[in-house]
């Protein structure tokens, strides 16, 4: 599966849980949340645009860092 890395403005465990919730709802993803560095690495066949739109549902500032 392709890996994608995103920067997400997460400040606490609650922020990380919000990211987990939207990604689990999307389905077809495996992900790792790096809260101290505010990064989310996602393994998924979904497009980076789909993943970005999904992460934007958290209300946090999100940017696509590129393939990993």
Swiss-Prot record:
The modification N6-acetyllysine is found at residue 60. Cu cation binds at residues 12, 15. InterPro entries: Copper_transport_ATOX1-like (IPR051881), Heavy-metal-associated_CS (IPR017969), HMA_dom (IPR006121), HMA_dom_sf (IPR036163). Signal peptide: none annotated. It comes from the Eukaryota. Residues 1-63 form the HMA domain. Pfam families: HMA. PROSITE patterns: HMA_1 (PS01047), HMA_2 (PS50846). GO terms for biological process: copper ion export; copper ion transport; intracellular copper ion homeostasis; negative regulation of apoptotic process; response to oxidative stress. The modification Phosphoserine is found at residue 47. The heavy-metal-associated domain (HMA) coordinates a Cu(+) ion via the cysteine residues within the CXXC motif. The transfer of Cu(+) ion from ATOX1 to ATP7A involves the formation of a three-coordinate Cu(+)-bridged heterodimer where the metal is shared between the two metal binding sites of ATOX1 and ATP7A. The Cu(+) ion appears to switch between two coordination modes, forming two links with one protein and one with the other. Cisplatin, a chemotherapeutic drug, can bind the CXXC motif and hinder the release of Cu(+) ion. Homodimer. Interacts with ATP7B. Interacts with ATP7A. Interacts (via dimer form) with SLC31A1 (via C-terminal domain); this interaction improves ATOX1 stability and controls intracellular Cu(I) levels. This is Copper transport protein ATOX1. The gene is Atox1.
């Amino acid at each position: 599966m392709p890996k994608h890395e995103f920067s997400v403005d997460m400040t606490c465990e609650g922020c990380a849980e919000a990211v987990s919730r939207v990604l689990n709802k999307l389905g077809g993803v495996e992900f790792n949340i790096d809260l101290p560095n505010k990064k989310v690495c996602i393994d998924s066949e979904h497009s980076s645009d789909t993943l970005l739109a999904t992460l934007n549902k958290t209300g946090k500032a999100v940017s696509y860092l590129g393939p990993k």
